[in-house]
A protein has these predicted regions:
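Nucleotide-sugar-dependent
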Residues: 18-22, 278-283, 290-313, 320-331
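A short alpha->beta transition loop at the rim of the catalytic pocket in nucleotide-sugar-dependent
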Residues: 35, 288, 316-317
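Acidic anion/phosphate-binding donor-loop and adjacent secondary structure
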Residues: 145-148, 182-203
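Carbohydrate-associated surface elements
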Residues: 163, 181
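A charged, aromatic-enriched C-terminal amphipathic alpha-helix characteristic of glycosyltransferases
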Residues: 194, 341, 358-391
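Conserved donor-binding/catalytic core segment of Leloir-type glycosyltransferases
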Residues: 199-218, 223-228, 235-238, 374
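Nucleotide-activated donor-binding/catalytic signature segment of Leloir-type glycosyltransferases, i.e.
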Residues: 239, 248-281
Length: 393
């Protein structure tokens, strides 16, 4: 029976390690803090590395994360074309299987748990036989057959939405909802907050937004409309807005450049870029409210759940958002539009909440939001996962 301490854990991630943290990065760090030896496998570098003599050669590098002694980062360059993934998946898997054998040899110690967040199915779980315990943990909306096939061989499946779990109903592995977590940097250390300090001092309200601004699934017209029609509100944005800042991808097309330029031109917008978690938490603590504005029809999460929600809730301040199914019956936690196909009413909802901010941020509501967030700390989520694994034995 696996426990989630004193183990060697290999995490398969579709996003590289970097400044911006998603669920897989937070779980890796929390598992390391709990006494596990964690190896975080970055997705492969594109294109084969070649020596001076010409033939392709694999490059596998394992090094310290720099933030915890138990957390190691694995970078690797393929010895075969990555494009095989899109044209000849069996050949790609043949090459990746040999690559994985070399990675495991480089690690040099037995793996107890493989924890996969990999919707691309780059490294199928069926490659890892007993006694390795295999966890499949999709936190993004699966699209395409490989995303579904990635669950094959899992001993247990966790996800942040019930909609995602439903898509894996064909697999016999037990399936459980585990909400997004929150890292220690965002957990309150003092007393519960009071009313907005900006309201007390007669200063402009500040509304926070976090996430990759390069994403094409943002509802850009609605967001620009909200900012332009609320000139007395300061909008502070954290997250990548240039390609070099992002470790989690994003568009570089002319529409994206035009959107970023429009934000930069607005006098009530501040773009902070990607920052470490501690700095992000400090910035959030200054906010009076938070805004989420995705186009559900394009949204990679399908408007079901977002990691940032838990971090916003940790401040106690109100969230104004497009429709999010996970929180549809929790009006104290979030103020959202009812529609699933458009955000036409989001600007009006934003104005209503801002005009009545003292009501939406009364102490009782703030306390409920903070307590909900604290109950979903990553340490608590790992405890829940460990118990669910134990209960299956």
């Amino acid at each position: 029976m696996p426990t989630l301490s004193d183990k060697t854990i290999l995490i398969l991630s579709p996003q590289s390690w970097g400044t911006m943290f998603l669920s897989k990065h937070h779980y890796a760090l929390e598992l390391a803090r709990m006494g596990n030896k964690v190896y975080f496998l970055n997705p492969p570098d594109y294109g084969p590395a070649r020596s001076n003599n010409g033939p392709a050669s694999p490059a596998i590098r394992i090094g310290p994360s720099g933030i915890h002694g138990n957390l190691m980062l694995i970078s690797h360059r393929l010895w075969f074309p990555y494009l095989l993934k899109f044209h000849a998946m069996p050949l790609f898997h043949a090459g990746m299987r040999l690559q994985m054998k070399r990675i495991l040899k480089k690690i040099g110690r037995p793996i107890d748990i493989v924890w996969s967040f990999d919707l691309g199915n780059l490294c199928p779980l069926t490659w890892f036989g007993p006694p390795i315990y295999k966890i499949f943990h999709p936190v993004d909306e699966p699209s395409g057959p490989q995303a579904i096939a990635a669950a094959k061989g899992a001993d247990i499946i966790f996800s942040v939405t019930r909609e995602i779990l439903e898509k894996y109903k064909a697999y016999p592995a037990p399936k459980h909802f585990i909400n997004h977590g929150i890292s220690p940097e965002f957990l309150p250390t003092g007393g519960f907050p009071v009313d907005s300090p900006h309201a007390v001092r007669g200063e402009p309200f500040r509304v926070g937004m976090a996430g990759n601004l390069l994403r094409s699934d943002l509802d850009r017209p609605t967001l620009i409309d909200i900012v332009e029609t609320n000139p007395a509100v300061i909008f502070e944005c954290w997250g990548s807005y240039t390609g070099g800042q992002s470790n989690i991808g994003g568009g570089g097309d002319k529409e994206t450049h035009a959107f970023i330029a429009a934000l930069q031109a607005l006098p009530n917008v501040i773009l902070h870029g990607a920052v470490p978690a501690a700095e992000l938490a400090k910035g959030f603590s200054r906010m009076d409210a938070f805004l989420i504005c995705y186009d559900i029809k394009k949204d990679q999460s399908g408007g079901t759940n977002y990691h940032k929600i838990m971090e916003y809730l940790s401040t106690g301040k109100v969230i104004i958002s497009n429709n999010v199914t996970t929180y549809k019956d929790m009006p104290v936690l979030m103020q959202m539009t009812a529609e699933r196909d458009n955000n036409d009413r989001l600007p009006a909802l934003f104005r209503q909440v801002i005009e009545n901010l003292s009501t939406y941020n009364d102490p009782a509501r703030q306390r409920e939001r903070i307590e909900f967030a604290c109950g979903n700390a990553y340490s608590r989520q790992v405890e829940r996962i460990a118990q669910l694994i134990k209960d299956r034995k």
